[in-house]
């Protein structure tokens, strides 16, 4: 049976699963691990087809969620960044009994722009898919650079993300294309409106992929959820502002436990 790569660490009583974004792997969390391990038992996974979980091919959002659940703790707080936020949200919808709380980071229930809904223009995602087949390493690097654009530490943060990707074998083009398909087609807005779990949404003020307008729109549509827009950060707030980010996660876990 194929197995995902998992790394479990930490001294806390509360299980926290961290799901990375498109093109990356669990190494992306290294700048917050030391801040979180005193409070949590961390479960760091390479999503199917990424990092050290290379035996898997492209798959749908629901398929990815089911595979991740197979080796996950029975109940945990789930934190998903970017595409990982969609996976965590899908798990909260399909298996709410496994979820103590949901945190999405620089994520959107619908990444693609529609009428009166801010997001990535469909032609931009289509362009990335086309470029993947021509020069996939350069395309991944361009996508990573977009994630840190505008922050004071943009170049340093982009180098860090690139180093995380290059730590391991690059994902197959089919896996990367499948991930972009998820970003292009997923729309969980209506389903998540009925989610009654403790739910925190974290955004970066300077994020060029998930506009901060999404936070305000969902505040009115999902009044049962909390949101924080982190000033000075872009698409990877845990990289640019690890201390403030980690504190948000710890505070949310404590609230969810009361």
Swiss-Prot record:
Record-listed E.C. numbers: 3.1.1.85
The keyword Plastid is assigned to this record: no
Keywords, comma-separated and alphabetical: Biotin biosynthesis, Cytoplasm, Hydrolase, Serine esterase
Enzyme active site: 82, 207, 235
GO molecular function terms listed in the Swiss-Prot or TrEMBL record: pimelyl-[acyl-carrier protein] methyl ester esterase activity
Catalytic activity: 6-carboxyhexanoyl-[ACP] methyl ester + H2O = 6-carboxyhexanoyl-[ACP] + methanol + H(+)
CC annotations in GO: cytoplasm
Record: residues binding substrate: 22, 82-83, 143-147, 235
Record bears the keyword Cytoplasm: yes
Role this protein plays: The physiological role of BioH is to remove the methyl group introduced by BioC when the pimeloyl moiety is complete. It allows to synthesize pimeloyl-ACP via the fatty acid synthetic pathway through the hydrolysis of the ester bonds of pimeloyl-ACP esters.
Family: Belongs to the AB hydrolase superfamily. Carboxylesterase BioH family.
UniProt subunit comment: Monomer.
This protein's name: Pimeloyl-[acyl-carrier protein] methyl ester esterase
Native organism: Yersinia enterocolitica serotype O:8 / biotype 1B (strain NCTC 13174 / 8081)
């Amino acid at each position: 049976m194929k197995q995902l790569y998992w790394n479990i660490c930490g001294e806390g009583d509360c299980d926290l699963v961290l799901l990375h974004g498109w093109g990356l792997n669990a190494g992306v969390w290294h700048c917050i691990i030391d801040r979180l391990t005193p409070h949590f038992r961390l479960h760091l996974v390479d999503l199917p087809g990424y990092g050290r979980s290379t035996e898997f091919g492209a798959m749908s959002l629901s398929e990815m969620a089911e595979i991740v659940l197979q080796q996950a703790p029975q109940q945990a707080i789930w934190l998903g960044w970017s595409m990982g936020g969609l996976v965590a949200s899908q798990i909260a919808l399909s298996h709410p009994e496994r979820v103590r709380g949901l945190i999405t980071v620089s994520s959107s229930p619908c990444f693609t722009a529609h009428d009166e809904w801010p997001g990535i223009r469909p032609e931009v995602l289509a362009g990335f898919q086309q470029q993947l087949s021509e020069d996939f390493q350069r395309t991944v690097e361009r996508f990573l650079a977009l994630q840190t654009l505008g922050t004071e530490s943009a170049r340093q943060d982009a180098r860090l993300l690139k180093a995380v990707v290059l730590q391991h074998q690059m994902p197959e083009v089919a896996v990367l294309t499948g991930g972009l398909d998820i970003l292009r087609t997923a729309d969980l807005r209506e389903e998540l409106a009925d989610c009654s779990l403790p739910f925190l949404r974290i955004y970066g003020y300077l994020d060029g992929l998930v506009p901060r307008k999404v936070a305000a729109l969902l505040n009115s549509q999902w009044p049962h959820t909390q949101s924080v827009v982190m000033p000075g950060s872009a698409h990877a707030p845990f990289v640019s502002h690890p201390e403030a980010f980690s504190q948000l996660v710890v505070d949310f876990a404590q609230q969810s436990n009361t």
